[in-house]
Amino acid sequence: MAALFFAEMRFDPHNPQHPLADRLVMSKGHAAPLLYALWAEAGFIPVERLTDLRLFSSDLEGHPTPRLPFVDVATGSLGQGMCAAIGSALNARRIKSDYRTYCLIG
């Protein structure tokens, strides 16, 4: 994931909702801590906030939630995010954008 996120994906860590940013869908939503760690390493989330994981007062839930600006779709059930990722990729083609969509499943 580190190689994909830091060597392959195109995004602005200070503007994760940039329309040309690549998309990453964590279809296995229970792997959200990995997503949070990647964004912390990129500088978007303060590393100290990673200890807030799964606290009631925290946005860093056990599964990704679109309340976070770097999450496009809430996921949970295995495979659920694949449909969202396919839709995102088809949308890129439809609007003639060159953003890429990646999906972590299984």
Question: What is the meaning of each model-derived region?
Answer:
Residues 1-106:
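Cofactor-binding active-site loop characterized by glycine-rich and histidine/acidic residues
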